[in-house]
UniProtKB/Swiss-Prot annotation:
Membrane topology category: Multi-pass membrane protein
Lineage of origin: Eukaryota, Viridiplantae, Streptophyta, Embryophyta, Tracheophyta
Domain notes: The N-terminal domain can bind calcium.
Organism: Arabidopsis thaliana
Name of this chain's protein: Calcium-dependent mitochondrial ATP-magnesium/phosphate carrier protein 3
Function: Calcium-dependent mitochondrial carrier protein that catalyzes the import of ATP co-transported with metal divalent cations across the mitochondrial inner membrane in exchange for phosphate (Pi). Can transport phosphate, AMP, ADP, ATP, adenosine 5'-phosphosulfate, sulfate and thiosulfate, and, to a lesser extent, other nucleotides. Binds calcium ions Ca(2+). Also mediates calcium uptake.
């Protein structure tokens, strides 16, 4: 935004006291006129003249208002209005909701309207959003104002503000108002860097990125034994059970053997997250249209390309990690990292650090596509059959994310096995040769070695990531 925008104000400072008289004055209506307006709105929903509203009437009324799906909260609105929980909303309950909501909306309207001229100017809205931790550019601000400003005069009156949010049953904070269509689901199962949703519009994006990175590091460390077990099983040609492999790892290195390679796995988080985020932000305007909205397919494309770039950049670390996890201990000791890296460079050349990159990149877009499709489907199913049209909360979203992530990982798992075997093999085996060797020697079963520990780590990895991320946000004052 231009430097002429007002500075050093506190637009979120609350007025001393807000009464219904303030609301009437702002709306330029009398108490009787307001009563008629509220009664008309109630009658609009009560089109059967029952004298009360049920959930079906509220849902039907919202649908006839042509409110976009992301703004529909029929179940929540019904629950908030039904104060005595008798399954129906009478006029007095409906009126009490409207009274409380209009007072709440006027309170935040006054907090944004620092000039106190009865309307919100774009620069006032911009400053309030920034104070709330939301950073938007001129085009996004113009679209936001245009959405609320019904008479298109460039400012927002309280009447327009009220009409936009009157049927929004949740707390009307600025962050809720701007982000209530966004859903956060942070899932890290140790395969690729996770970028927190909504981060690109947050002024403290670097701190959010740090919080996500630290959460991923803690999660990967906690699930490192399962990761080591998975990799060891993936490279074994002969059938080997989980328990014999666990005993083998214990015999070689005792407890620390289960954490071999975890240091590199954690070190990958920061550069991979940073590269993926920066690449994603650069690709968005190239893929998006004039309105800046890239849509679901655009997000999938931009995310896939950003993920491929990040994966390529940190791939040598991933290969060395695999070699470290799969090589045999010498004299009961794990090989030194620097010696292992040097041996690869000297014996196999620099190209060896990119063995298995192609199958790794091949799996990125299918994994993301399956993950996204499954997540949205599960969320819709939970909304329909479990929550009765209420928006799913963090726990449901986390469960949907874990399930979709596990499904996506399972579908592309054969590519992951081929990649791991190519990484661990010092010979110049191509992807096609590795596929043929596995199919010929082990059949389809060979492509799913290590799948069990991979799936077992999904729940703890995702849960730990989510808990640590939320705790970090709280400690960094990012909520």
């Amino acid at each position: 935004m231009e430097s002429s925008k007002p500075k050093n104000r506190n637009p979120m400072k609350k007025p001393v006291s807000i009464t219904m008289e303030h609301v009437l004055l702002a709306l330029r209506e009398t108490m009787d006129e307001r009563e008629i307006r509220i009664r008309s709105l109630f009658d609009f929903f009560d089109n059967s003249n029952l004298g009360f509203l049920d959930y079906a009437q509220i849902e039907k009324g919202l649908a006839s208002l042509q409110i976009p799906p992301e703004y529909k909260y029929a179940r929540d609105l019904f629950r908030v209005c039904d104060a005595n929980r008798d399954g129906r909303v009478d006029y007095q309950e409906f009126r009490r909701y409207i009274d409380a909501k209009e007072l709440e909306l006027y309170r935040i309207f006054q907090a944004i309207d620092v000039e106190h001229n009865g309307c919100i100017l774009p620069e006032e809205l911009w400053e309030a959003l920034v104070k709330a931790g939301i950073e938007i550019d001129d085009e996004e601000l113009a679209r936001f104002v245009e959405h609320v400003d019904k008479d298109n005069n460039g400012t927002i009156t309280f009447e327009e503000w009220r009409d936009f949010l009157l049927l929004y049953p949740h707390e009307a904070t600025l962050e809720n108002i701007y982000h209530h269509w966004e859903r956060v689901c942070l899932i890290d199962i140790g395969e690729q860097a996770v970028i927190p949703d909504g981060i690109s519009k947050h002024v403290k994006r670097s701190r959010l990125l740090l919080a996500g990175g630290l959460a991923g590091a803690v999660s990967r460390t906690a699930t490192a034994p399962l990761d080591r077990l998975k990799v060891v099983l993936q490279v074994q040609r002969a059938h080997a059970g989980v328990l014999p492999t666990i005993k083998k790892i214990w015999r070689e290195d005792k407890l620390m053997g289960f954490f071999r390679g975890n240091g590199l796995n954690v070190m990958k988080v920061a550069p991979e997250s940073a590269i993926k985020f920066c690449a994603y932000e650069m690709l968005k305007p190239m893929i998006g249209g004039e309105d800046g909205d890239i849509g679901t397919s655009g997000r999938l494309m931009a995310g896939g390309m950003a993920g491929a770039l990040a994966q390529t950049a940190i791939y040598p670390m991933d290969l060395v990690k695999t070699r470290l996890q799969t090589c045999v201990s010498e004299g009961g000791k794990a090989p030194k990292l620097w010696k292992l890296t040097k041996d690869i460079w000297v014996r196999e050349g620099p190209r060896a650090f990119y063995k298995g990159l192609f199958p790794s990149l091949l799996g990125i877009v299918p994994y993301a596509g399956i993950d996204l499709a499954a997540y949205e489907t599960l969320k819709d199913l939970s909304r329909t059959y479990i929550l009765q049209d209420t928006e799913p909360g963090p726990l449901i979203q986390l469960s949907c994310g874990m399930t979709s992530g596990a499904l996506g990982a399972s579908c592309v798992y054969p590519l992951q096995v081929v990649r791991t075997r190519m990484q661990a093999d010092s010979s110049k085996t191509t992807m096609k040769q590795e596929f043929m060797n596995t199919m010929k020697g082990e059949g389809l079963r060979g492509f799913y070695r290590g799948l069990l520990p991979n799936l077992l780590k999904v729940v703890p990895a995702a849960s730990i990531t989510y808990i640590v991320y939320e705790a970090m946000k709280k400690n960094m004052a990012l909520d």
